[in-house]
């Protein structure tokens, strides 16, 4: 009889998703090894190591994923995060308009810096988890279940970037690392995904939007309360139709600003003078707060980032490989769900492993195919795919809403309709999450805004949120047709009453 041993998992990528995956599987009893291209973040200053990462907004889905592994981690993060109760719209005339995310329940999303989040998650990993930094995946021999890496003395590059000097300094791990399962948490340009596509027929798509993003900085203001020059409990948006500026608060009183602008418009801002005129025309209030020199210095020196949507299916191969986070489903950042969805992947995978009774130990030889684990990974890929496609679609839709629709009277009308209908036909409270069932609410009853379902209802899958919203849009259209309304008014309430039987069925 073969001797029992712990299953060996190799996780490629020690970002937030990779680190949480490592902690989750370690606590299940797996032998865990993690490879990361970049330097060890532990003990470093948590100031951003690069300026290509948009501030993160962590909300209920991400927090529930953290709690599913270790409740104390989620609570610790909330102490370092800043709650944002809504959007603060900055109009060109200087007026500001607050749009609450949850006018009835008062729930908030939370601003946190990516370096802090990542550092704290890596710090939470116990010594039993083998961490190898400055280690870059070179290739995977899936036939023999062995991964090979190269090592660098130090690196400050992003994944996917490598200078000629770095290439010469790399040394390959000739022995390689054997595994039962390799998990790709290595981002949009995943090398694990590339290796899987050589071993399995995988449908893959990527599409870029025509906008670049540039990170800017609003320093703290010593003369303002807490150092905040703007209300710290809002996500600030300067929507200008073709482009927009957003601002998320930091603990030190500063704001991380991000400009989203078409590449075609960006090409016209090729001098400091043209950039200054652009900011003065479209974002005068931001210029007044930040200062023109600081804003232009950041604009000139900071890199231009691309925004891409990536989908691949299946996201698992045999019992030996699976993709999580951006490696499987990179999305544009306009719904604030990239991080939350990636962390939720970990919770869903853990739930499916539990449902399939996957033991942390096995009597199979290292690297031998496990039919039961293969079924579990396939179940994850099949069940998760609809939700991943839905949130990528919703993120693209919100791309238009944030920069343009928030200025539309119809957007305000729809918000009022949602508020009235939610009061009249309140949906059932959030269902208790179960280890065996990641999304216990299979069908949302009553009326709930799309934003609430996506952001504050981790018991509801993204695909169900999208289905419900499409139906609610049909009801709103019906209400408008019945009443010819331009406000909620009596006709809207009448139509709501007419729709009551529908709502109870749906």
Curated annotation (Swiss-Prot):
Cofactor(s), by name: FAD
Region (Disordered): 153-175
The enzyme's E.C. designation: 1.14.13.9
GO molecular function: FAD binding; kynurenine 3-monooxygenase activity; NAD(P)H oxidase H2O2-forming activity
Gene3D superfamilies in the cross-refs: FAD/NAD(P)-binding domain
Pfam families for the chain: FAD_binding_3
Pathway terms, separated by semicolons: Cofactor biosynthesis; NAD(+) biosynthesis; quinolinate from L-kynurenine: step 1/3
Keyword set includes Transferase: no
UniProt-listed GO biological process terms: 'de novo' NAD biosynthetic process from L-tryptophan; anthranilate metabolic process; kynurenine metabolic process; L-tryptophan catabolic process; quinolinate biosynthetic process
Reaction(s) this enzyme catalyzes, per UniProt: L-kynurenine + NADPH + O2 + H(+) = 3-hydroxy-L-kynurenine + NADP(+) + H2O
GO (cellular component) term, any one: peroxisome
Keywords: FAD, Flavoprotein, Membrane, Mitochondrion, Mitochondrion outer membrane, Monooxygenase, NADP, Oxidoreductase, Pyridine nucleotide biosynthesis
Subcellular location: Mitochondrion outer membrane
Bias type Basic and acidic residues, positions: 162-171
Function: Catalyzes the hydroxylation of L-kynurenine (L-Kyn) to form 3-hydroxy-L-kynurenine (L-3OHKyn). Required for synthesis of quinolinic acid.
Family per similarity comment: Belongs to the aromatic-ring hydroxylase family. KMO subfamily.
Protein's name in the database: Kynurenine 3-monooxygenase
